[in-house]
Amino acid sequence: MFEGQPKGLWALALANTGERFGYYTMLAVFILFLQANFGWTSGTAGTVYSSFLACVYFLPIIGGAAADKWGYSKMVTIGIFVMFLGYLLLSLPMGADIPAIVVMVAALLLVSLGTGLFKGNLQVMVGDLYNDPKYAQKRDAGFSLFYMLINVGAMFAPTAAIKIMDWAQLSLGISKSDSYHFAFAVACVSLIVSIAIYYLFKSTFAHVLTTDKAAVEKNTKELEEMAPAETKERIVCLCLVFAVVIFFWMAFHQNGATLTYFARDFVATSATGVTAMEMDVTNLVACIFIVYSLCGIFQNKGKGKIIPAVLIVAAVAYLSYNYMNVTEVEISAPIFQQFNPCFVIALTPVSIGIFGWLAKKGKEPKAPVKIGLGMIVASIAYLLMTTTTMALPAPDAVNPKHLADVNPNLLVTTYLILTFAELLLSPIGISFVTKVAPTKYKGIMMGLWFGATAVGNFLVSIPTMLWGNEHYVVWGTLMCICLVAALFIFSIIKKLNKVS
């Protein structure tokens, strides 16, 4: 899985990991901060949250166009510094009056702009690593690994947010509403780490940088010119995929919206036994070690199996010790956001292994089929939520209160299913864009991928506005949206497979 990948992949992935750690630390508590600090309703907080996400994913369109003109590396560097300024403003406690709202909006715009310059362009650079015929067959696996490392940062983010807030409240006597700003400050530190990694290991991916406009024009002329009809066909197919992506992200990013509301209002606030262990990120890391070590045993021969076997024994011993000493733990709503990235990391080698095995047999489904399957799997997650919450009382959207003690594993299972969907759609979709997009439109096409994600994230607010209705209304709506999107993509699958 890790062998035969270009060295630049690891440098770019780790630089992105640092940035994503900060972003998800902020995002883990953001919607709760809006309600705690400003006293807004679930619908209002959800609208602000989804509008921010929309900006984060819309501005890569501008970032992609700028990179096509001035170069990817320059835009990535500028993006990191702009994001840093945004997170710095968010980390300042300003109260809850009009000036505080103005500063928050300015900070969110800076974070969005910086992300727009950074995120998409970094991923285009990753795609360009695989233009070398030596690595061409490893493109999908490479993007899956890239996506996995992003989630390393995301997995630790909720715990970091909760721990830093608890420390601020207990050790410094900071109020809960002001302690959120300490979580936002973590993002500033993570960006310093990110830019350091980017420049320290720049030599590993320097050959894909297009900072010289003259060089870009020269290389473009040297490339075989694609026929206008083929260019049009590829762009149309990409736009059709973008249309489906909108509805996936609308459903998926409920993890920071209605699913977080559900965790706060309906999930048990404490746990014991195995469930309590699930809430500790170190136990999740031990489980990940077991998965990767099992993969190592299957892949290696002879003495190569010894180290993975030792790691499995050590991880099992660690988990056994923790189980014998586990006590009741309190459950905070943001902690559930650690499960999706944990599952991404754990399941990535499984996903790569399955599709690698199918590829050897000549039966690996093409990217559009994987995307359609991802939408079906996402609908199953919300089918689970629909059927298991029918007996619960309707939530209070205006004055949030704890109304039930649902088993936390309902949400854990939902996140697991959504992760299966994500692995089928997100890294595969990004790989599809870098493969299918005409060379001279790569930057703008990657930007449009994020633009579609932006629209989906803006639509995240619709279920938050439904919050307050019966549960089957909220979750059933999301289930139906995913199913319709799946039917659409399978109805045009021949057209999409043609350009794959």
Language-model features, listed with the residues they occupy:
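Intracellular loop-helix junctions on the cytosolic face of multi-pass helical membrane proteins
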Residues: M1-P6, N131-D140, I162-E328, S351, ...
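Helix-loop boundary and gating motifs at the non-cytosolic
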Residues: E3-L53, F252-F262, A317-V329
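Hydrophobic core of transmembrane alpha-helices in multi-pass small-molecule transporters
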Residues: T17, G86, P99-N121, A394-L424
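Central cavity-lining transmembrane alpha-helices of secondary-active solute carriers
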Residues: T47-D68, M155, Q338-F355
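Glycine-rich segments within core transmembrane alpha-helices of 12-TM secondary carriers
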Residues: V56, K138-Q169, A183-S194, V281-T282, ...
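Cytoplasmic membrane-interface "Motif A"-like loop-to-helix N-cap segments
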Residues: D68-M83, Q137, Q299-P308, W357-I376
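C-terminal ends and interior cores of transmembrane alpha-helices
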Residues: G79-P99, V316-V326, G356, L373-L403
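Symmetry-related core transmembrane helices of the 12-TM Major Facilitator Superfamily/SLC fold
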Residues: V105, D178-L200, L373, Y472-K494
